[in-house]
Amino acid sequence: MRKKWKMGGMKYIFSLLFFLLLEGGKTEQVKHSETYCMFQDKKYRVGERWHPYLEPYGLVYCVNCICSENGNVLCSRVRCPNVHCLSPVHIPHLCCPRCPDSLPPVNNKVTSKSCEYNGTTYQHGELFVAEGLFQNRQPNQCTQCSCSEGNVYCGLKTCPKLTCAFPVSVPDSCCRVCRGDGELSWEHSDGDIFRQPANREARHSYHRSHYDPPPSRQAGGLSRFPGARSHRGALMDSQQASGTIVQIVINNKHKHGQVCVSNGKTYSHGESWHPNLRAFGIVECVLCTCNVTKQECKKIHCPNRYPCKYPQKIDGKCCKVCPGKKAKELPGQSFDNKGYFCGEETMPVYESVFMEDGETTRKIALETERPPQVEVHVWTIRKGILQHFHIEKISKRMFEELPHFKLVTRTTLSQWKIFTEGEAQISQMCSSRVCRTELEDLVKVLYLERSEKGHC
């Protein structure tokens, strides 16, 4: 008979339930003396039941939790009854197998959001394996993902050391196991109750560094239960950490799987950030950029001389700045004192061209005041054919730290609109044929020129 929720044996089951113990229930008194239980940052009323959600595995339907009258959260494994048929059927979102003649009616109403990742649609609660998310994973590690309410949760899982020559794959886990090791299923476990103290509050973060996993994520590497201890600090030994999980959340904007993972957060291709080191905090003088799935970090070099006598250090910036520094003036363009051109407000335009390994990345950026941000249009071209095009919006503070950008002109919103409309046409046209000068010609639209008589 086919088993469900094969997770590597009793040790792993105990580990997941130990996570529930660490998570902690919390009593909260409100008006009318109502008692609530707090579990995973959610409130539950007395008597309310639910299945716990464990990333990256999704809802664990073979564990029931209930909020007791004294505010304790009690979780127990589901006891499955014996089935009296030859071919019991496993139903999605149910723990115990059923005989075909006792199946519940099909409900066509879908209440939960699906997820889209790398061109594939996954339903709420569905598990899958992702490749290429963690570039620094070890040979004994794999990436497990699950879909929950439209978001994709992925974890780096360290698989246990195998003692057999021919391991096999099992459902609902990216790790391979020895034949027979994964045969223990939730429904055949005893229905022990695991109590969670009401005065304990152990919240978990959705954006933790993979160098500092929370204790609840390390529960998978525990050797026994109860009496096992969690270990803080660096990742455990690869042979012991059979369930070490690093959680990242992938929003729907990462549909192509081109993301970088840093400090427990994900960044899209072309996105930049300052690294956050546990011992030093945010390192302002280092800038990292996501290049497809590889993060490239460079040190920011400050000028040796400044145009003012006493440059000032500003919090959040690497280099000193001159107080009251004015924007650069552009030769060949004349604007009035308020930065207007023919009565229309102008905004600075920046350009960056970077070439590496036969690939050209060209960026055009427009700085706006309302809202105060920079809109960056990124083109990646190889052998004259557009490989990738996307638009990202970043803060001015972040943009000032980006390398390779230079101020090329100032333009108006009307000219920028013409540029973006032409850009949309070129992005379709140049994705299937060679384009040599189309983008360069389009950029010229942003340059503002008066007629010889000075009329607008």
Curated annotation (Swiss-Prot):
Residues 1-27 form the signal peptide. Keywords: Developmental protein, Differentiation, Disease variant, Glycoprotein, Neurogenesis, Osteogenesis, Repeat, Secreted, Signal. The keyword Phosphoprotein does not apply. It is found in: Secreted. PROSITE patterns: VWFC_1, VWFC_2. Residues 202-223 are annotated as: Disordered. GO terms for cellular component: endoplasmic reticulum lumen; extracellular region; plasma membrane; synapse. Expressed in the developing cornea and in the eye anterior segment in addition to the retina. Differentially expressed in the fetal brain. There is high expression in cerebellum and neocortex. Expressed in retinal pericytes. InterPro entries: CHRDL1/2 (IPR045717), CHRDL_1/2_C (IPR045716), VWF_dom (IPR001007). This is Chordin-like protein 1. It comes from Homo sapiens (Human).
